[in-house]
């Protein structure tokens, strides 16, 4: 019973305080994440409380954008939220969302704060208030329109989910699982194994989308309930550490396709050297001829690499899960739920199928199919889009790095709603079944402010990705043969 209580407390209040990273900075562009270290997930220390009071006791001042921008370092970091200035220097290391907060040191964090935080977090801001922002010029019209649009969507109830809709998705997933298992129960041939593994891979992909929904707080108003089902679908079904995923995914949402000043990726989703370079600027950081030899063929390698995506993610997740720095409760929860995944997966294979070769074939094929199906959707969403290393506001950063694919009932389901990826990046806590309702308004917003609303067919998106990879591969070939 004590373990259950610990688990619920962990989900509700301390799920994301797994690690805080030390950073190396390049100008104002944010952190390069390097070394993990354990941070206590308990309450504030007396020293922290005193430091917090010292912030509160200061007489509020008036600050310019330049004043705020000068406080952009660990230990000396300010942030703007709704035209007010906050000194978060003593809070940043204990931020429940982890290191993602560092991507907005010295910047206006209004939109990212509103996007990712519950109402209770707004009250906590008062503890760090030091003054008001004095703008030398009016707020960017794009940001003003975006904030007005978000407020309108809230009034219209578009951030409230249909529980019946999510129940239906869960039942569809259960049917996929049952069909996969029934196939190999009925027929033990290799053809049946391929069919069953394909269905199981599709099941894993679709459970990935459900985990994504829950962990973005799209389904329930209660964050603990969302976290519980996130762990169920994430750790238990997919076998991925939820906390590992949250750490990298939060940074992806706040800094999509962003690099530091030296073009080292901050967004781990484009940190794929030495196998893939997603921009010529990233390629320019490569000096090794051996790596250039690989990169000149990257447009041919992308499809085979997608098959291996699950293995890459699994490796990263397991390194995180079995990190000895995890505290006892957290480590037990992560290890136990991930171990449960491998237990049922292995049991299904070896209990149903005879021998060793056939169970292993089924397990490997499932992983390959799941990797392809997940990776294919991710690749179409952001790859081949702009990669940048200068500070951008939240809205522009999301739109210029993101691509939609043409909607249809199958694409909506297959991609887990990520065919409306632009809408998801602008409003990640909105239930995905509402994205089609807001798409025309988002497209109009982009058109009004001269931003490309990239919405192409799946084939068109695939061609765009391969074309971008080939252009970079050609550059790698030129550099290689020029040496």
Curated annotation (Swiss-Prot):
<dbReference type="Pfam" id="PF00487">
    <property type="entry name" value="FA_desaturase"/>
</dbReference>
<protein>
    <recommendedName>
        <fullName>Bifunctional delta 6-fatty acyl acetylenase/desaturase</fullName>
        <ecNumber>1.14.19.38</ecNumber>
        <ecNumber>1.14.19.47</ecNumber>
    </recommendedName>
</protein>
<feature type="domain" description="Cytochrome b5 heme-binding">
    <location>
        <begin position="60"/>
        <end position="134"/>
    </location>
</feature>
<keyword id="KW-1133">Transmembrane helix</keyword>
<feature type="transmembrane region" description="Helical">
    <location>
        <begin position="337"/>
        <end position="357"/>
    </location>
</feature>
<dbReference type="GO" id="GO:0046872">
    <property type="term" value="F:metal ion binding"/>
</dbReference>
<keyword id="KW-0408">Iron</keyword>
<dbReference type="InterPro" id="IPR005804">
    <property type="entry name" value="FA_desaturase_dom"/>
</dbReference>
<dbReference type="InterPro" id="IPR036400">
    <property type="entry name" value="Cyt_B5-like_heme/steroid_sf"/>
</dbReference>
<feature type="short sequence motif" description="Histidine box-3">
    <location>
        <begin position="421"/>
        <end position="425"/>
    </location>
</feature>
<dbReference type="Pfam" id="PF00173">
    <property type="entry name" value="Cyt-b5"/>
</dbReference>
<comment type="function">
    <text>Fatty acid acetylenase able to introduce a delta(6)-triple bond into gamma-linolenic and stearidonic acid. Also able to introduce a delta(6)-double bond into delta(9)-unsaturated fatty-acid substrates.</text>
</comment>
<feature type="transmembrane region" description="Helical">
    <location>
        <begin position="191"/>
        <end position="211"/>
    </location>
</feature>
<keyword id="KW-0444">Lipid biosynthesis</keyword>
<feature type="short sequence motif" description="Histidine box-2">
    <location>
        <begin position="249"/>
        <end position="253"/>
    </location>
</feature>
<feature type="binding site" description="axial binding residue">
    <location>
        <position position="95"/>
    </location>
    <ligand>
        <name>heme</name>
    </ligand>
</feature>
<dbReference type="InterPro" id="IPR001199">
    <property type="entry name" value="Cyt_B5-like_heme/steroid-bd"/>
</dbReference>
<keyword id="KW-0443">Lipid metabolism</keyword>
<keyword id="KW-0472">Membrane</keyword>
<dbReference type="GO" id="GO:0016020">
    <property type="term" value="C:membrane"/>
</dbReference>
<keyword id="KW-0479">Metal-binding</keyword>
<feature type="transmembrane region" description="Helical">
    <location>
        <begin position="360"/>
        <end position="380"/>
    </location>
</feature>
<keyword id="KW-0560">Oxidoreductase</keyword>
<dbReference type="GO" id="GO:0006636">
    <property type="term" value="P:unsaturated fatty acid biosynthetic process"/>
</dbReference>
<keyword id="KW-0812">Transmembrane</keyword>
<keyword id="KW-0275">Fatty acid biosynthesis</keyword>
<feature type="transmembrane region" description="Helical">
    <location>
        <begin position="225"/>
        <end position="245"/>
    </location>
</feature>
<feature type="binding site" description="axial binding residue">
    <location>
        <position position="117"/>
    </location>
    <ligand>
        <name>heme</name>
    </ligand>
</feature>
<dbReference type="GO" id="GO:0102865">
    <property type="term" value="F:delta6-acyl-lipid desaturase activity"/>
</dbReference>
<dbReference type="InterPro" id="IPR012171">
    <property type="entry name" value="Fatty_acid_desaturase"/>
</dbReference>
<feature type="transmembrane region" description="Helical">
    <location>
        <begin position="302"/>
        <end position="322"/>
    </location>
</feature>
<keyword id="KW-0349">Heme</keyword>
<comment type="similarity">
    <text>Belongs to the fatty acid desaturase type 1 family.</text>
</comment>
<comment type="pathway">
    <text>Lipid metabolism; polyunsaturated fatty acid biosynthesis.</text>
</comment>
<feature type="short sequence motif" description="Histidine box-1">
    <location>
        <begin position="212"/>
        <end position="216"/>
    </location>
</feature>
<feature type="transmembrane region" description="Helical">
    <location>
        <begin position="164"/>
        <end position="184"/>
    </location>
</feature>
<keyword id="KW-0276">Fatty acid metabolism</keyword>
């Amino acid at each position: 019973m004590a373990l259950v209580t610990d688990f619920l407390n962990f989900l509700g209040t301390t799920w994301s305080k797994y690690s805080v990273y030390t950073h190396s900075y390049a100008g104002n562009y944010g952190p390069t994440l390097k070394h993990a270290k354990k941070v206590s997930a308990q309450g504030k220390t007396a020293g922290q409380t005193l430091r917090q009071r010292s912030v509160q006791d200061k007489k509020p001042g008036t600050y310019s954008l330049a004043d705020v921008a000068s406080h952009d370092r660990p230990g000396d970091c300010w942030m703007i939220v709704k035209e007010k200035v906050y000194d978060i220097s003593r809070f940043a290391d204990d931020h429940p969302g982890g290191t993602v907060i560092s991507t907005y040191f010295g910047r206006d964090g209004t939109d990212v704060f509103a996007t990712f935080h519950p109402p209770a977090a707004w009250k906590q801001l008062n503890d760090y208030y030091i003054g008001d922002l004095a703008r030398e010029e009016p707020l960017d019209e794009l940001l003003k329109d975006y904030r007005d649009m978000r407020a309108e969507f809230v009034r219209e109830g578009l951030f409230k989910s249909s529980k019946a809709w999510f129940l239906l998705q869960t039942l569809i997933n259960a049917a996929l699982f049952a069909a996969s298992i029934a196939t190999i129960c009925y027929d033990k041939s290799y053809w049946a194994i391929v069919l069953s593994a394909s269905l199981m891979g599709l099941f894993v992909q679709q459970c990935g989308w459900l985990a994504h929904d829950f962990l973005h707080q799209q389904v329930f108003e209660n964050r603990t309930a969302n976290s519980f089902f996130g762990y169920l679908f994430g750790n238990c079904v997919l076998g991925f550490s939820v906390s590992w995923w949250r750490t990298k995914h939060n940074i992806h949402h706040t800094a999509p396709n962003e690099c530091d000043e030296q073009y080292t990726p901050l967004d781990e989703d484009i940190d794929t050297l030495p196998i893939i370079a997603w921009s010529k600027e990233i390629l320019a950081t490569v000096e090794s001829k051996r790596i250039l030899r690989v990169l000149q063929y990257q447009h041919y390698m992308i499809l085979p690499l997608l098959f291996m995506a699950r293995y890459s993610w699994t490796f990263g997740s397991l390194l995180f899960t079995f990190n000895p720095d995890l505290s006892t409760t957290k480590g037990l929860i992560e290890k136990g739920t991930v171990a449960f995944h491998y237990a049922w997966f292995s049991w299904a294979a070896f209990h149903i199928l005879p021998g060793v070769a056939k169970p292993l074939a089924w397990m490997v094929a499932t992983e390959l199919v799941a990797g392809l199906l997940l990776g294919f959707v991710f690749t179409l969403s952001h790859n081949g889009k702009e990669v940048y290393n200068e500070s951008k506001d939240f809205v522009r950063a999301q739109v210029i790095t993101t691509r939609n694919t043409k909607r249809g009932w199958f694409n909506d389901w297959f991609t887990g709603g990520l065919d409306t990826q632009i809408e998801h990046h602008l409003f990640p806590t909105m239930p995905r079944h509402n994205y089609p309702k807001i798409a025309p308004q988002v497209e109009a917003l982009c058109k009004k402010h001269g931003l490309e609303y990239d919405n192409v067919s799946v084939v068109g998106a695939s061609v765009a990705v391969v074309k971008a990879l080939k252009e970079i591969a050609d550059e790698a070939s030129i550099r290689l043969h020029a040496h």
